Amino acid sequence: MNNYKLQAPYEPNGDQPEAIKKLVKGVNTGKEFQTLLGATGTGKTFTIANVIQQTGRPALVLAHNKTLAAQLCNELREFFPKNAVEYFISYYDYYQPEAYVPVSDTYIAKTASINEEIDMLRHSATRSLFERKDVIVVASISCIYGLGIPSEYLKAAVKFEVGKSINLRSYLRSLVENQYTRNDIEITRGRFRIKGDVLEIGPAYEDRLIRIELFGDEVEAIRYVDPTTGEILESLEQVSVYPAKHFVTPKERLESAISAIRSELKTQLDKFTYEGKLLEAQRLEQRTKYDLEMLKEVGYCNGVENYARHLSGREEGSPPECLIDYFPKDWLLVVDESHVTCPQLHAMYNGDQSRKKVLIDHGFRLPSAADNRPLKCEEFWEKSKQTLFISATPGQWELDQCDGEFIEQVIRPTGVLDPVIDVRPSEGQIEDLLSEIRIRAEKNQRVLVTTLTKRMAEDLTDFLSENKVRVRYLHSEIHSIERIEIIQDLRMGEYDVLVGVNLLREGLDLPEVSLVAILDADKEGFLRAERSLIQTIGRAARHVEGVALLYADNFTDSMKRAISETERRRTIQKKYNQVNGITPKPAGKKIENSILSFLELSRKLDAGGLSKDLINIVNNKTDAILGSSDNQCLLEELPDLIEKLEIKMKDAAKELNFEEAANLRDRIKKLRQKLARNN
């Protein structure tokens, strides 16, 4: 039974109906690989949404970075509001892997900061895969890393059912074994508390509490409860509480793992002793024996992931179980921007192994640590049964898997043509660019400028700023979420120009951009290859007046091919518009904060409030309007006001002032409705 309910204010048109028909037919007939070659702005995501809806398969949509994954997730959530569209990326805000530098005899311990909200979204994804068929998981490459054992994770779930008698002490022990902790004062995700005949649990996979009401040993009621106000949100007949961590090891398996680790330790110590590596042997023995004691006493140790092979009972060299193994057998893989994502997949394993080998050779880890790894590319494709590659510029590897065949989608639903390409000499390019920027700024349009080096981007940004241009610089040191904010500020008109090096390409949805300027377009190389040029030019393909300026003194082969392909598409698009009487019109895509509000990455403190820098911004902007009528607030002030009121609501609840908290909650609800109506 197909449970997907696709909701969209428009029907497929242009090339979309034919592309959908061919892709669906390929999936239903068991085709292993298919490629959708879709030009920028032709609605590839909508096409894929239709394919998922018509095939009814659980789907994994793979993106090559967090920013694009967030954008895709938001778009798919809009198309499937009644289905489970989940988000799965690395949960590290900061990650420094364990490493050793032999030249300087420097050991670097692993340090990491885990983002609780992303961890919750990851748990939500695996829970949905166990409980529903209508699931779309949008993930980054981190999904190919080990994620426990799905069968053990499912088996460890603690089940409650209304009318059933339970042994409360036994159930509490099960929660503790599943890495929940008891805290009778404050309950958050991963904690539980018991007061009289009421057990409350903060599940790892959502921000609602589960309340189990008992009458003696019998479960009398199961409810979802608002953690702030205590309001009952929903009553249930039964519920499964999944473990607080994905890595679940039963007691009997832990004992056999400890035995296997001891055996491997002895073998490696004998090897080091035979080779005369006494320092390495002493180091390994000391570290491993300490870890074994920790595992024996508390079931956990620092760096426990390095013993994953033994803890999961895998054979040496066997692939780890990852997110893919949580999917049912008939799932569908969609690889977005495949020309970038596939090479990433193929490179992850080798980079991981080179670091691990140094640690093993110098006695910091046992050889089995090498099996705590991402999937090899061949292991990944073996687990993937049916794949759709999506790209405006598919790589040769993807085309080879499809025997050179692809499904083309060139016509935009808006009728907008590919950008006009204008090649100009590099002499005087900066002054020329400045005049073009001023023309666009007067029309309230946006400009992207891409340079070859970081230094050039910095210097250009300084020059434009000195000439009273509202400009920002996007570079690799900016965190993913700040990057989303910068891109959104560009769309909202906070500034007119965005300068970058290699960050202004795949997947950025910027309908307000009418001009893309490529400096030094004739410098042949990765950043000015045919595929890179087509992708960069495509950033102006959503605007009716889209233009790509290429500053160059020579025509390279890459430039010729990119220009030729763009002209080919323009010819097809122009002919289609003439035949069908279509006049190009703006995309009119909403500017929204949904990505930022959806992620909420590192914006909250451990106590649950907003980050200090954001609080300062919110305080400055909203102190004046907190006391005024909500109807007097400007639309752009509403998000900040809502966040400020949420802080006050949580503070009121902590002080047990539930009446004020409830009033604030109702006020927030009305403000959200007002915001939704105007978006």
UniProtKB/Swiss-Prot annotation:
GO terms for molecular function: ATP binding; ATP hydrolysis activity; DNA binding; excinuclease ABC activity; helicase activity. ATP binds at G38, A39, T40, G41, T42, G43, K44, T45. PROSITE patterns: HELICASE_ATP_BIND_1 (PS51192), HELICASE_CTER (PS51194), UVR (PS50151). SUPFAM superfamilies: C-terminal UvrC-binding domain of UvrB, P-loop containing nucleoside triphosphate hydrolases. It holds the Pfam family UvrB_inter. SMART domains: DEXDc, HELICc. Residues 429-583 form the Helicase C-terminal domain. NCBIfam families: PRK05298.1, uvrb. HAMAP family: UvrB. Belongs to the UvrB family. This is UvrABC system protein B.
